C-alpha cells in the first residue's frame, strides 16, 4: 500500500502552473486528481478562453486497459451535445501521454454549497434543481448513456442553472445489454434520490437521532416522500424517467 502511494506521489505529480501543452493550452491550476485522471483549469492562449483539461495519470497510461477506458470517455463526450453538460473541445497525445479538453463550467458544486457555505434549499428549490437534473438524465438515458457517478461534487450550479460534470465512470450501452441497462439505470435513479435528500436536509434544524431515518427527521409532503421512496428503492422502483417526471411534477405542485 505504501509503495503504491509512493509511486503515485512520484509519477502522478500534477503539471506545473504555466506549462503550455500542444502549443495552445496553458495550465493555470490543478483542480483535482481522480481514480485515473488529473484535471486542470487551463487557458487556450490562442482564443483566450478558459477550458478544463484532463490528463490520464502517468501510472495508468502504461496500462492498455486504462488507455482504452480514457479513449472511451473521449468518444462518449464527443457524442454528447447538451447545454448543461460540458462540451468536448480537443484531444491530443504528447510523448505517449493522452489529454483531452472540454468546456469550463463556471459556478459552485452542490457539495460546496451544502457543506461549506451551508446554503439552505427550500423544498421547492430542491425539487426544481432535481427537475433540471432529471432533464439531463432523460437526455442521457434516451441515448443509453448512464453517468454512474451523480454526486453533489459533480453537479454545478450557476445562477440557478444546473450542469452535470465528470463522465469518467459513464458508459454508453447497446440495446442488447438489457441487464446492465437495468442496473445502471437504477444506479442513476438512486443517485438522483440521494441528491434530493441532501438538498432537503439543508433546511433541517432538528437534532439528528442516533438511529433516526430521513422519514422520521424530515417533514415532507406525501408526494415528495413517495418520490424519494421510489428513487431510493424503498418502494417500487421507477423503470423509466417518464414516471419520475410525473411524480416529480406532483411533488412540485404539493409544495407550491
Swiss-Prot record:
Keywords: ATP-binding, Kinase, Nucleotide-binding, Serine/threonine-protein kinase, Transferase
Active site (catalytic residues): 149 (proton acceptor)
Keyword Kinase recorded: yes
Keyword Iron: no
EC number: 2.7.11.1
Residues that hold ATP according to the record: 31-39, 54
Protein name from the UniProt record: Probable serine/threonine-protein kinase YbdM
Taxonomic source organism: Bacillus subtilis (strain 168)
